Amino acid sequence: YSRLWDYRIIARLGELAIALHKFSNDLRLLQSWGELEEPYDATQVGSSAMPYKRNPMRAERLGSLSKYLMFQVPGVAAMAATQWFERTLDDSALRRIALTQSFLAADAIVLIARNIMDGLIVHPGVVERRVREQLPFMAVEELLLSGVEAGGDRQDLHERIRQLTWQASERMKTQGGENPLRGMLAADSQLGPLLARQPAWEPERFTGRARE
């Protein structure tokens, strides 16, 4: 049969690997911020030198095996492309290794991903704190659009907002505390009246279709 069928099958498994690798990366980033954590065993050790560490071992393993599976796709593509009238045996080693190992790797990453998802730990308090810190920066896009719709000069409004957001960000980095941007916007002669007409900055208004 055409080796294109081998490629099509492994390419589909490669798509699974891509999706689960993306999931593992996102989880590791969110865990570094403290929003999510993968499940941990009571006796699990993150580092022999640093007892406090809680490394995302499962997510790292998921990413590693997903990479392996993803890298099988171009090999099988080359195998299909270099066949001689479908009659040579120079594909025998790759077929025996790549096809079987790809299915084993796919099985492994699905099991690991399911294990992570079944025991995923969410820290709502950390999520709420980060939303409070970052939501004002997200909301200024809405403020800019409403200002333009009201007849304001886009470049002028953009520059005013840019300067205030940078000042607010710098203050948070150097002094800590809550995000001061809303108060800074309210005190601006042009942005303050626009802000007063805006709906409350409720997080739910900025999640798009995430709930779906």
What are these regions (language model features)?
Residues 35, 50-212:
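Glycine-rich cofactor/substrate-binding loops
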Residues 1-82:
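Internal glycine-rich alpha/beta core junctions
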